[in-house]
Amino acid sequence: MEFSSGLRAAVDRVIPQDDRPGGWAGGVAAYVAASPDLGWAADALLRLDKRLEELAAGRPFVDLAPEHQDELLNILASGPQGAADFAALRRIAFEGYYAAREGASPAGLDLVGFRAVPEGVEPVESDLVPDVGIGGVRRDYDAIIIGSGPGGGVAAQLLAQAGRRVLVIERALRSPNAALRGDHLRGKRNAVYRPTAGPGAGHPRVALLPEADRVLDGVDDASLYGLNANAMGGGTRLWQGMAWRFLPEDFRMASVYGNPEGASLADWPVSYADMEPYYSRAELELGVAGSEGNLTTRTPRSTRYPLPAFGTEPARELLAGAAERLGWGWGPIPLALNSEPHDGRPACVRCPQCVGHACPVDAKNGSHNTFLPRAAATGNCDVLYDAEAIEVQDGSGDARVTVMANTSGDPVRLDLRADVVVVAAGAVETARLLLASGIGNDHIGRHLHDHRFATVAGTVTESVKPYRGPGHSIATLDHVHTDSIRWGGGVLVDLVPLLPLTAASTPVPGVPAWGKEHKAWMAGQRANMLGVFGMGQEIPMPMSRVTLGDVRDRWGRPGAALRKLVHSASVEVEDGMAVRAEEWLRSAGATGLFRQRGPATASAAGEHSCGTARMGLDPTSSATDPFGRPWGTRRIVVCDSSLHATNGSVNPTLTIVANALRVAEHLVSAWPATAAGRIA
């Protein structure tokens, strides 16, 4: 894309030169020359260039005094069409100057003190399980597991250690960590272009929105698409690592709160007491850093955390004092990150982009570097990458799986047999596969829900959020299942430092959206931004669901259609968390508080999606039995977040792991007979 001299000058007013380079020389020129993704802005930039010429009244825009250039840009930015066109220029300027990306070190990163890998740290790659390849795949296994995330990984480990011959099918390529971090334009959490952890083209979904249905392919908006992570290890490859236990009330939501009209709250078929031994094992097997104290008083424990909690940092100190003034309990967040060397891997080096990016030293604990390597070490587990299960069949004597392998090259169809098929593809894809295969009852796909989120931020007088990880540091559970917020409330944690591009694009109120003052804020006061993030109960509804859409994927299968309804009780949770977050920040001395708001139904699915094959004691109100077997089937077992009847007031991954341990342990002890077709 060509930029005229006038547009280049405009870029340098959006990000002016001072003692640091201006926008064009500081990264935008190189970005524009190298990026293939900017075609969306071509018409807007042509209009903007022409309008600048008109406003300059015959003089080249580049020759005007900086103050005059700013005046004209402000005129443009105040009109409807001009505002949209100028916003396109501003976006490109910020992407070029503040976005980390492969092979580029724009000046904005140095301006804000951002280093993706801390100085002096030598990256360490994960030793991923090898690819068995098409030629190594047997046609007959004891178990075929679809998905390598926390549920599938746990199932693979327990079954392989029990002597069962296992095949894990993973849709993603065997990508190294280096390919899954450091690109702030395509990272899973902040992707503005095709996400690196996305499934790619040929994997459409339909978002059934109130205003109109929208077809999204695997290269589109990661948020609206409902992307978790298309990677070996699933979401645990890229997560922040918050590893909470659900509270006892989280397993009894219907009993504790009743069922508001239009909702489908249900109790789990297990209690916290039933789950506690599996939580203890999950923390040990995964590797969780934490400490006993205020955050563990309501979740009785039989073991201590295997790793010490991460040390303090400025935001924790400030918010801890504020919590104590309010009489709230607080503590360090339990994280599945190595706070010290563990399991043959290094300690966390506190990189500034833990959330949504792979770890530079393999200190982030997930399925890819814990459960699956242990499964492979038995000699009983194969992993087939770059492969998709397109159909599963349940039978009296065996189960069948149809797989498309080598999907990034010349695809090959494989027809495989197993005693058991474990479906662990996440709440959306698990439901889609079961529905497309004609498996299960009417509850398959229903009760899709996630969490409710609230973010409040302000400014304090000191630097509290420099670019140093791992990210979230302090939490309070005082508003979880207490009288302060209805319907179970949610956990409140400190907000992670926003990545440079995100911070530049969304400065705090009162800071100009571009120009000299904006750049000065980025260089200094940005680190004084203190936020509190709330994550709480979302009340499930039967019509929030995954169905089969009127689109086809590259194999001719129907894509998932996602419908999200928001119950008024969920909004009460969200608003309640915002009130308590503001209270905490005021106690910490923050000023200029503002609530970051998004659409009520930003996405029907996301990282925490659950409930689409929920467990229960009765097929009239659930999709599976208490051990993940869809009602009416013999040899199909679900083993992921789809099983969650409700999703708790905290992050769900440790519960996914603990429940997978319980489900897989039962499967080992109740293996289906190969001839009679029954489960003991």
Give the label of every model feature segment.
Residues 158-161, 165-189, 378, 387, ...:
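Glycine-rich loop(s) and the adjacent beta-strand/alpha-helix scaffold that form part
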Residues 192, 199, 203-208, 218-224, ...:
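Conserved redox-cofactor binding core of oxidoreductases
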Residues 149-150, 428, 643:
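Residue-level detector of alpha-helix initiation sites
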Residues 331-336, 347-356, 390-393, 527-538, ...:
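A glycine-rich dinucleotide-binding beta-alpha-beta segment and adjacent secondary-structure elements
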Residues 212-235, 239-240, 244-245, 250, ...:
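FAD cofactor-binding and catalytic pocket of flavoenzymes
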